[in-house]
Regions:
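Negatively charged, low-complexity tracts enriched in Asp/Glu with abundant Ser/Thr
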Residues: 2-55
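An almost-null, non-specific background feature
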Residues: 20, 24-31, 35, 73, ...
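Amphipathic, interaction-prone secondary-structure segments
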Residues: 42-84
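A cross-kingdom feature marking charged/low-complexity
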Residues: 45, 112-121
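A short, surface-exposed interaction/processing loop segment used at functional sites
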Residues: 83-112
Length: 121
């Protein structure tokens, strides 16, 4: 787990920091917290990480796709009990889970793993 602490002014900047945190967590996991060298498949995956990340703008959400799976959804504008920038776990490929946000890319200070957003504690 990596804690993303940066506050951002734009959703695009926030998504960039979130995915950088996820990539850093992948490197941490692949190198056993830095105890071994990054090699083979893991080295290849980190090299392709940024090019494998796609941002898809929707009506209410920005969908962040890593390779072929949805990494998370980002709320574009305030609605219901969600704020602009809230990170939502994917319920499926086309919809987020609306139970609770996993953090906010604009406010920072949220945990992230290479597998996706974590619950706030």
């Amino acid at each position: 787990m990596i804690k993303v602490s940066q506050k951002c002014k734009t959703l695009e900047e926030g998504i960039k920091f979130m995915m950088a945190g996820a990539k850093a967590d992948y490197v941490r996991m692949s190198t056993n917290n830095g105890l071994k060298e990054l090699t083979g498949y893991s080295l290849e995956q980190t090299g392709k990480w940024d090019s494998n990340t796609r941002i898809i703008n929707g009506k209410k959400y920005i969908k962040v796709v890593q390779e072929n799976g949805v990494f998370c959804f980002i709320v574009k504008e305030d609605f219901k009990h969600f704020k602009k920038g809230d990170i939502l776990k994917a319920a499926g490929y086309n919809a987020p889970a609306l139970n609770s946000p996993r953090g906010n890319v604009l406010n920072g200070n949220y945990p992230i793993q290479w597998t996706g957003p974590l619950y706030l504690k």
